[in-house]
Amino acid sequence: MPFIKAVKSSPYFSRYQTKYRRRREGKTDYYARKRLIAQAKNKYNAPKYRLVVRFSNRFVTCQIVSSRVNGDYVLAHAHSSELPRYGIKWGLANWTAAYATGLLVARRALAKVGLADKYEGVTEPEGEFELTEAIEDGPRPFKVFLDVGLKRTSTGSRVFGAMKGASDGGLFIPHSPNRFPGFDIETEELDDETLRKYIYGGHVAEYMEMLIDDDEERYQKQFSGLIADGIESDQLEDIYAEAYAKIREDPSFQKSGKDAAAFKAESLKHTQRKLTAEERKERFNAKVIEAGRA
């Protein structure tokens, strides 16, 4: 009798255990989270920090986060919407913007814990694979672990751009080069030139030049912001290099200057107010009267 219908009886429902809410919503991988936050049992009051990297359609978010019993605590936060302050006004979600955001959160976190002058990282990145090493007769480097969430860790992914930026910014992030752009699986070697090209927006410049030759209309549409500002492909490297230098000079957070009250009032214009019990009764009575007339 292979076709017996499974009957979910009362014992089934009484023993049923629901999964965590964020697992049901598909937001958290608890298998990975458990391993990211579990601390050694012989350490006390020594938080385990994570570099949390998340992407939206337009921006990149990087945070240095530690977990406690009552929730996660954010030590430092950086958002790619802050990059126009440093001269990067376009493509705030691409690989190079992820690198810049990672660099910004690293410098901001080190400044907060007083290690910015001791661990400067890679001031002039050339695409080489480097890990932050401890200095002699000084404090150890600030150690974090990469938290990619649910993002797929493909070779060349933007999440590793943020990690590379944070590593070059002076944080110690245990990693290998085999997920960076330019890594050859067969020879197991990293092409420094390819990685450097991504750090300074060279892949964007190449794409711009290709569109100029092949599809002028698409170029005008896709790079309208750069065209409006008179930026050409050969200027991108200098723009990104200057932005990295400015981030190192002043990584501090600055408020946007928007009026919070005005912003709230504007957002409430599109929010429907919940009716009171009296208003619901009045609306119901009005509908009954209208239906009786019909």
UniProtKB/Swiss-Prot annotation:
<dbReference type="GO" id="GO:0008097">
    <property type="term" value="F:5S rRNA binding"/>
</dbReference>
<dbReference type="Pfam" id="PF14204">
    <property type="entry name" value="Ribosomal_L18_c"/>
</dbReference>
<comment type="subunit">
    <text>Component of the large ribosomal subunit (LSU). Mature yeast ribosomes consist of a small (40S) and a large (60S) subunit. The 40S small subunit contains 1 molecule of ribosomal RNA (18S rRNA) and 33 different proteins (encoded by 57 genes). The large 60S subunit contains 3 rRNA molecules (25S, 5.8S and 5S rRNA) and 46 different proteins (encoded by 81 genes). Component of a hexameric 5S RNP precursor complex, composed of 5S RNA, rrs1, rpf2, rpl5a/rpl5b, rpl11a/rpl11b and syo1; this complex acts as a precursor for ribosome assembly.</text>
</comment>
<keyword id="KW-0699">rRNA-binding</keyword>
<dbReference type="Pfam" id="PF17144">
    <property type="entry name" value="Ribosomal_L5e"/>
</dbReference>
<dbReference type="GO" id="GO:0003735">
    <property type="term" value="F:structural constituent of ribosome"/>
</dbReference>
<dbReference type="GO" id="GO:0000027">
    <property type="term" value="P:ribosomal large subunit assembly"/>
</dbReference>
<comment type="function">
    <text>Component of the ribosome, a large ribonucleoprotein complex responsible for the synthesis of proteins in the cell. The small ribosomal subunit (SSU) binds messenger RNAs (mRNAs) and translates the encoded message by selecting cognate aminoacyl-transfer RNA (tRNA) molecules. The large subunit (LSU) contains the ribosomal catalytic site termed the peptidyl transferase center (PTC), which catalyzes the formation of peptide bonds, thereby polymerizing the amino acids delivered by tRNAs into a polypeptide chain.</text>
</comment>
<feature type="modified residue" description="Phosphoserine">
    <location>
        <position position="81"/>
    </location>
</feature>
<keyword id="KW-0694">RNA-binding</keyword>
<protein>
    <recommendedName>
        <fullName>Large ribosomal subunit protein uL18A</fullName>
    </recommendedName>
</protein>
<keyword id="KW-0687">Ribonucleoprotein</keyword>
<keyword id="KW-0597">Phosphoprotein</keyword>
<feature type="modified residue" description="Phosphoserine">
    <location>
        <position position="10"/>
    </location>
</feature>
<keyword id="KW-0539">Nucleus</keyword>
<dbReference type="GO" id="GO:0005634">
    <property type="term" value="C:nucleus"/>
</dbReference>
<dbReference type="InterPro" id="IPR005485">
    <property type="entry name" value="Rbsml_uL18_euk"/>
</dbReference>
<dbReference type="GO" id="GO:0022625">
    <property type="term" value="C:cytosolic large ribosomal subunit"/>
</dbReference>
<dbReference type="InterPro" id="IPR025607">
    <property type="entry name" value="Ribosomal_uL18_C_euk"/>
</dbReference>
<keyword id="KW-0689">Ribosomal protein</keyword>
<dbReference type="GO" id="GO:0002181">
    <property type="term" value="P:cytoplasmic translation"/>
</dbReference>
<feature type="modified residue" description="Phosphotyrosine">
    <location>
        <position position="12"/>
    </location>
</feature>
<keyword id="KW-0963">Cytoplasm</keyword>
<comment type="similarity">
    <text>Belongs to the universal ribosomal protein uL18 family.</text>
</comment>
